[in-house]
Structure formats: structure tokens, C-alpha cells
């Protein structure tokens, strides 16, 4: 009998020893898919966050860049990944534009939304020698001159910064198509065009122009935020500059494939919240002019719905909406 009892006890102990680690989550590395190239804005935010995230989780967090198709390749990879909690993604505003533009049948509705990690605001930046000293002067000129007289850039046609520019004009009761949009491969080439006089303004983020602003080669006339930016305290908001409400920012968000286990999701969400609040993560982002953000449960879902609707309205005004 004693042998049987000891054997049973050993069996039970063995079961607990096996079942404990098998149910621990996470127990292996986690990957975050970034739809944009290494060294870009989204990549920088995610790598900064990932360093804190792996400290909180106790397992490695690997950042994987899946580029191509204007972000479609990477966003699709996130959507189609196994929903086991070990593959997450970094979504950007473009996924809220694809379906309206008709470029891909994917949207934020296809993802489990955790939270935004950070934002960088759009702005209106001109060359240092531009005749426009204020946004009010620039808007008045766009209003009074023929369509195409003034131009902007910052991304491709229908991209995030194009939406920022179109929304600004619509808020000022100006046909968004009056402003000529010059496609570019990003902020750097667009800012070169601004400084050379090739285009009137840059409606991407002043964060992308930070070194040029500090060198006095460009000026930011306004930021597209509800309140002034800590990074650019001298730049008025659109409301302050022209008396109209318009805000727009690029955001970088933590997401997962649909269908992730609720318990695993909660573990990841709580760890991610702690990671984003870590002093070294906050300071590293702020040093780059990036504003850290963390959404309460459900808050990002509401934001995403509002963002998608607002962007669709602007794209319709620009004559770019296909759906």
C-alpha cells in the first residue's frame, strides 16, 4: 500500500511539474511585425518599446520588418499571422486608408487593437525664406489663387500626410484639390523640395524637420494638434492660427491578429502598458520629438473608428476614394 501511495504521489507531482510550464505564457520569444523599413519612424518607436516590453515579459521580443506595397505587405502579414499571442504587429495610419483608396481590402477592423504607442503630429513647414510668416497668410493665398498655384508634399498620393493637408484645407472651407500634391518617398526629399523652392510647404511632421528647424533652414507655421506641442512650443495649433479645428497625427500602434486568447491578450496588454511607461522608453521617444501614448481598454477601438471615418471623408474631398 505504501508503495502505491508513494507512486501516486510521485505521479501527481510529476503532472504538476509538467503542466505548470506548459501553461505559462509567454514561454518563448515574441515577434512584432513592422510594415516599414528599419530605421524609419515606426521602426524606431517599436524598437524602443520592444526593449522595455521584453524586460516586462521576461522573454526576447524580436522586431521583424516586412516591407512592400506601401505597408500592405506587413499589415497583411500581421492580419494573417497565427493568433497565438506570439506574433504581434505595429500598425500605422495607412491601414485605415487602404480600403477607401481601393489599394487593399484590409482595415483596422481586421485586427485586435491594443493601444497606440506614440504619435507625431502633422504640421505646416515652409522654407526659412518663404514669404509666408503665418498659417493665416498661407491659407489666404491658397484661397485666393488658382488651383495648383501652391503645392505640398511629404508622402505619396493619398498617404497620411496628404490626408493631413487635405483635411486642413477642408477645415478652412477650401477645396482640398486646390493644393497641388507632389508625391515623394518621405519627409527628407519633400523637405529638400521645400528648401529649394520646388514646393510651397511640407505637411508632414515637424519632427521629421527637427534638425532643419534647429539650423534655421525651415519654419513651422503650425502644428495639427488640439494643444501646443512640448517639442515645438512656439508653433501655434491650427485653431490658434486660423480659428478652425483640425488635428492630425501619425500614430504607431500595438496590434494582434484577430482571435487571440483573452488571457494571453491581457498578459500582453498589461506588460505593454508597463513597458510604454518605463522611464527609459518615455525619455528615448521624447528625445526624438515623439509623444508617447497609451490607450485605456477600448479607447483605441473608438479612436480607430473615428480616424477611419475622418480619413475617408478627406479622401473623398481629394477625389481619391474608391470605396
Mark where each language-model region is:
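Bacterial N-terminal signal peptides
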Residues: 6-19
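An extracytoplasmic/periplasmic, membrane-proximal ligand-sensing/linker region
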Residues: 27-29, 262-323
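C-terminal lobe and pocket-closing loops
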Residues: 208-277, 306-309
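Positively charged n-region of N-terminal signal peptides that target proteins for export
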Residues: 1-5
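Hinge/capping helix and adjacent helix->loop/strand transition within the periplasmic-binding protein
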Residues: 77-86, 99-189, 238, 251-284
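A ligand-binding cleft/hinge motif common to bilobed small-molecule-binding domains
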Residues: 93-103, 166-173, 196, 200-234, ...
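Short, flexible turn/loop "capping" segments at secondary-structure junctions
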Residues: 25-27, 115-119, 245-249
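N-terminal (or domain-start) structured segment
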Residues: 23-110, 174-201, 292-295, 317-323
